[in-house]
Amino acid sequence: MTIALGKFTKDEKDLFDIMDDWLRRDRFVFVGWSGLLLFPCAYFALGGWFTGTTFVTSWYTHGLASSYLEGCNFLTAAVSTPANSLAHSLLLLWGPEAQGDFTRWCQLGGLWAFVALHGALALIGFMLRQFELARSVQLRPYNAIAFSGPIAVFVSVFLIYPLGQSGWFFAPSFGVAAIFRFILFFQGFHNWTLNPFHMMGVAGVLGAALLCAIHGATVENTLFEDGDGANTFRAFNPTQAEETYSMVTANRFWSQIFGVAFSNKRWLHFFMLFVPVTGLWMSALGVVGLALNLRAYDFVSQEIRAAEDPEFETFYTKNILLNEGIRAWMAAQDQPHENLIFPEEVLPRGNAL
């Protein structure tokens, strides 16, 4: 018996090969297999958001006006979450809630579920697009890995957090002022600013901004004067083989400033990747914790002493009182279906009052 080893070649292309050739063809806008997920989902998510902010009211879900048609502007318009009574319903247009009635579906908050789902899939499609292109041109996949940070934050905030609560109602609505309201809600009900995962997220994002500013300024400061152009952009050939700036000079400069400096470009750029992505992932993990109602840092001894001693108060105890005020105000305003009424004597008062 003879076994022949070799590369198998097909005589003619099948449907998959034809599709692969067309999708991955070199064109102005790359499509790829990832584009089958990215482009339709991005189109539907953006289209749903523009439709909702232009025409759809939030009167039936939040008791609010939220569209341009009702007088809102870009900062106050939003696609609002479904009512709390709908819990975690997928709110399909053909489902038992809307029963195929598009107007009723919009009034119930179906557009929010539509935008959230397609938005998440579009972000995942964009990450897969970066994977696919990187593989095609034989690059490492670090762009896609970095983009996992924003995806983790989006999925944790818009999907996982409300899944841990009583319904989609407690997710952020898709609008600028609506997300500001959600941030205040997070602070009042979860003391989010004192959560260690939020602290790591802030350190990551602001640290990344600092690293970008330092890196950009350092590169500009140490450019080689190779060209005759009057500015940076005309001085160099985009296909040049030589270095654009002096890493050695930059290293000497920061060694004198801080006493330490990055010794090579690989470590420097990996650190610039690591800091923001880790910060975003930590924030996402923190939000998953909030979905389970895990608490932030509590300094109970300070709260007890502040309650017993009228002259003792810290910034922490003042913030706790502020959180109580946010809860007392937002619970009644934000959940009108609960008919909550708080008499004045139960509202929080600081020792200074």
Swiss-Prot record:
It catalyses: 2 a plastoquinone + 4 hnu + 2 H2O = 2 a plastoquinol + O2. PROSITE patterns: REACTION_CENTER. A plastoquinone binds at H215, F262. The modification Phosphothreonine is found at T2. PSII is composed of 1 copy each of membrane proteins PsbA, PsbB, PsbC, PsbD, PsbE, PsbF, PsbH, PsbI, PsbJ, PsbK, PsbL, PsbM, PsbT, PsbX, PsbY, PsbZ, Psb30/Ycf12, at least 3 peripheral proteins of the oxygen-evolving complex and a large number of cofactors. It forms dimeric complexes. Its main location: plastid. The modification N-acetylthreonine is found at T2. This is Photosystem II D2 protein. 2 of the reaction center chlorophylls (ChlD1 and ChlD2) are entirely coordinated by water. Belongs to the reaction center PufL/M/PsbA/D family. Chlorophyll a PD2 binds at H198. One of its GO terms (biological process) is photosynthetic electron transport in photosystem II. It comes from Lobularia maritima (Sweet alyssum). Chlorophyll a ChlzD2 binds at H118. Keywords: Acetylation, Chlorophyll, Chloroplast, Chromophore, Electron transport, Iron, Magnesium, Membrane, Metal-binding, Oxidoreductase, Phosphoprotein, Photosynthesis, Photosystem II, Plastid, Thylakoid, Transmembrane, Transmembrane helix, Transport. GO terms for molecular function: chlorophyll binding; electron transporter, transferring electrons within the cyclic electron transport pathway of photosynthesis activity; iron ion binding; oxygen evolving activity. Pfam families: Photo_RC. InterPro entries: D1/D2, Photo_II_D1/D2_sf, Photo_RC_L/M, Photo_RC_L/M_CS, PSII_PsbD/D2. The chain crosses the membrane at residues 41-61, 125-141, 153-166, 208-228, 279-295. Photosystem II (PSII) is a light-driven water:plastoquinone oxidoreductase that uses light energy to abstract electrons from H(2)O, generating O(2) and a proton gradient subsequently used for ATP formation. It consists of a core antenna complex that captures photons, and an electron transfer chain that converts photonic excitation into a charge separation. The D1/D2 (PsbA/PsbD) reaction center heterodimer binds P680, the primary electron donor of PSII as well as several subsequent electron acceptors. D2 is needed for assembly of a stable PSII complex. One of its GO terms (cellular component) is photosystem II.
